Amino acid sequence: VNCTGQDLSAVPPDLPGDTGILLLSANRLVSLSTDAFLPLAQLQDLDLSDNGLVALHTGALLPSLRELILSRNALGALPPLQGLPALTRLAVAHNSLAALAPGAFLTVQRLQDLDLRGNQLRTLPQEAFVGLRALKDLDLSDNLLEELPKELLQGLQKLETLWLSGNRLQTLPTGFFPEGHLFAYVFLTENPWHCDCDLHYLRSWILQN
């Protein structure tokens, strides 16, 4: 169901019960509760981008939802990700996230694709992504990251692609990339890398991989 750009300030109450894909981008959904989607038991993909969204209240069980797009909104904090057991893709790009809590994604352990680019993240707790054993793609590009904890990627056994471009990173801690883990792609461009002995680990890792 395509409700893009309809100047909506609330979710339409008369959506077909068998809706699988719901496009609600470019509306005026400033504050929203996932309770609004409870009648849509088969809902798999939900696009809420470009709404000026400042608050998303979760908790209602949406058992089939696999993809949630929250990009280009005004979220200052990551919503609690409750009631989304099947979620595999989450996009919160181009919001105003300044921090992530440890274990922020423990309730969505099937997540495979996490897009956090274009926020205001300056640092991350080492447990930011704990529990995401199925995660394949992690995009942290175009934030304000100045340093990253050594253990950030530990436990992300399936991670294939990592974007760190466009941050303020000058170095990475020794052992940052898990020993023996093979990545398909790692993007490190557009950072002010400080070329001294502290960067020896990163240089060696690049040459080996």
Which residue stretches match the model-derived regions?
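The feature captures the LRR N-terminal capping module
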Residues: V1-A26, V30-D50, A55, L65-S71, ...
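Consensus "Asn ladder" position of solenoid repeat domains
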Residues: Q6, L24-N27, L48-N51, L70-N73, ...
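Leucine-rich repeat
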Residues: S9, V30, V54, G76, ...
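Hydrophobic anchor residues at the C-terminal helix/turn of individual leucine-rich repeat
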Residues: P13-P16, A36-F37, T58-L62, L81-L84, ...
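Hydrophobic packing within well-folded, soluble alpha/beta domains
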Residues: L22, L43-L48, L68, L87-V92, ...
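Leucine-rich repeat domain C-terminal region
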Residues: K136-D137, D142, E146-K150, L156-N209
